[in-house]
């Protein structure tokens, strides 16, 4: 049974074999054998650091398979997001270990957010550099992100609320919060890509919070909306107003 699944899910999918290194493909094989997923379809999104595939669970539900690329050099630049986080004090040397820890960090961040009732993509499993996630969309087509949608004042308030909930409930700062990693659905905004999120004890957490607020405020201003002064938003979130 697994041989057929592996053949269907990988051998016919040249993209997987071309994009992913052998250890990553073997990790996905292991996940299939463990019945975490049963089939891998095409690429949903490809970036410098990761490739996201549309996959199918053993229950025939759509899921997202996020694979962090071991070969990329950009992870070395992101080491500061981990080294200052008290939750990850011991970092083994080497890019591969850093990427594995990054995947684990994203899984842990998402799990914390779910536990706090924050609308984020639900994590299903993590193994090495492969993260299995809830699929936000239908029939292999993901929901549109904020940058792809018309936005309004409600979206702005919801985005700021996400930053506030991360800070006050999960004690996290996203660190890379933007219109590119927020899905707009009929039920509201859903946040994803939380690998960069840091604990409030991280030495750069407040600067990252300020940057997150500025970035998303700038987006809504470009879309013609009036936004609250980012400094006031920052102080409110920090409870200084």
Model-flagged regions — what are they?
Residues 1-5:
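Conserved small/polar residues in nucleotide/adenosyl-binding loops
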Residues 8, 15-142, 220:
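Conserved ATP-binding subdomain of kinase catalytic cores across diverse folds
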Residues 13, 17, 95, 99, ...:
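Alpha-helix initiation/capping motif
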Residues 42, 123, 176-177, 230:
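Residue-level detector of family-conserved "landmark" positions at structurally sensitive sites
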Residues 69, 137, 179, 184, ...:
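Short, glycine/acidic-enriched loop or turn micro-motifs at the edges of active sites
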Residues 94-120, 126-127, 142-180, 185, ...:
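Conserved kinase catalytic-core helix
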Residues 141-145, 199-202:
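Short small-residue beta-strand/loop micro-motif enriched in glycine and branched aliphatics
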Residues 155, 167-174, 185-241:
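C-lobe/activation-segment region of protein kinase-like
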């Amino acid at each position: 049974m697994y041989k057929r699944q592996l053949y269907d899910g990988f051998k016919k999918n040249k993209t997987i074999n071309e994009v992913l290194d052998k250890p990553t493909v073997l990790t996905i094989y292991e996940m299939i054998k463990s019945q975490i997923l049963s089939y891998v379809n095409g690429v949903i999104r490809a970036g410098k650091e990761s490739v996201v595939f549309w996959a199918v669970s053993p229950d025939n539900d759509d899921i997202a398979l996020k694979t962090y690329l071991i070969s990329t050099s950009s992870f070395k630049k992101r080491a500061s997001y981990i080294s200052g986080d008290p939750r990850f004090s011991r970092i083994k040397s080497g890019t591969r270990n850093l990427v594995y820890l990054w995947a684990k960090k994203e899984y842990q961040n998402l799990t914390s957010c779910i536990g706090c009732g924050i609308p984020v993509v639900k994590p299903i499993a993590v193994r090495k550099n492969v993260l299995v996630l809830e699929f936000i969309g239908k029939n292999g087509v993901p929901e549109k992100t904020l940058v792809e949608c018309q936005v309004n004042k409600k979206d702005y308030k919801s985005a700021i609320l996400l930053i506030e909930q991360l800070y006050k409930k999960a004690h996290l700062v996203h660190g890379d919060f933007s219109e590119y990693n927020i899905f707009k659905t009929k039920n509201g905004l859903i946040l994803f890509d939380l690998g960069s999120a840091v604990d409030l004890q991280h030495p750069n957490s407040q600067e990252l919070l300020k940057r997150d607020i500025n970035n998303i405020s700038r987006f809504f201003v470009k879309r013609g909306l009036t936004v609250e002064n980012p400094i006031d938003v920052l102080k409110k979130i920090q409870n200084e107003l």
